[in-house]
Amino acid sequence: MSRPVDDGFSLPAAWAPHSRCWLAWPTRAETWSEHLDAVREVYSEVAKAIARFEPVTFITKPKNVAEVSLSTGTGVATLSLPHDDSFLNDNGPRFVTDGKGMIAGVSFRWNAWGNRYPDHERDAAVAPGLL
């Protein structure tokens, strides 16, 4: 397997134009404790704001699909994909480009910030699951 850089790919800046915003619905009660419902409301509002400018997809546990759809309305898509937490920027895939229109996905090995959370197997499978 080759490395993306060997094939002429590089990681665009976070602010570079892209075709979709991916988010993960907050699920880990230990992270958010009594604030989980409020955090979900904020995530929903952020998704709706972004959706005014570009497509947004929430990955969500199968049991939360209806809740996410109800919370975000028709302007935000959902994808049923089991996960442990909502930090998709850390455990999700990276999309690299070659500057000629080609896009590739990269999946890194996720270990929940040095095994901070022992239960992170579903998060470790998110990037490969999206790719």
PLM feature spans:
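The feature marks the mature, well-folded catalytic cores of soluble enzymes
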Residues: 1-131
